[in-house]
Amino acid sequence: MEKFTTYTGVGVPLQRSNVDTDQIIPAVYLKRVTRTGFEDGLFSNWRQNDPNFVLNTDTYKNGSVLVAGPDFGTGSSREHAVWALMDYGFRAVFSSRFADIFRGNSGKAGMLTGIMEQSDIELLWKLMEQTPGLELTVNLEKQIVTAGDVVISFEVDPYIRWRLMEGLDDAGLTLRKLDEIEDYEAKRPAFKPRTNA
């Protein structure tokens, strides 16, 4: 997993609340057996049926920092929702409230979910409306987002923050203990069952 310390990308204002995982990626797109290629399903109902949807505009179609309304990622636990956002190009999502499971899935996959006050979310929306294509700089170490001269703080779970800054997914966490695992396996009695790769 790629380390996340600072990142700059075009901010995308998603001025909708209660965006659930089925709206992020409908179930029809969940039949794939790979972990990539889900970007075509991202917000597909809105992208296909609303020509004015934010990701259908030239200004925001290549955005990578999503600023969403409250209660983002609610609904069923669907890792595909995180994968779709990441496959599209998003590195960070900010909201005043996230579903806990969505936040956990995001952190494990390498995407930052930062919590801001709703008034700060609305300030970012206003700034992005005034300056379409505004770049947002996310500093995970300092837990701030910079938009022009405006600096806004955000919260993130300390453990997820550490994992993102270290670039550690679940496999990476296990590999940090590889010496101890190999030492244990070497000392384990030969008559006990083993799994071979």
Curated annotation (Swiss-Prot):
Keyword Glycoprotein attributed: no
SUPFAM superfamilies: LeuD/IlvD-like
UniProt pathway annotation: Amino-acid biosynthesis; L-leucine biosynthesis; L-leucine from 3-methyl-2-oxobutanoate: step 2/4
HAMAP family, alphabetized: LeuD_type1
Free-text function comment from the UniProt entry: Catalyzes the isomerization between 2-isopropylmalate and 3-isopropylmalate, via the formation of 2-isopropylmaleate.
Homology family: Belongs to the LeuD family. LeuD type 1 subfamily.
The protein, known as: 3-isopropylmalate dehydratase small subunit
Organism: Corynebacterium glutamicum (strain ATCC 13032 / DSM 20300 / JCM 1318 / BCRC 11384 / CCUG 27702 / LMG 3730 / NBRC 12168 / NCIMB 10025 / NRRL B-2784 / 534)
Classification lineage: Bacteria, Bacillati, Actinomycetota, Actinomycetes, Mycobacteriales
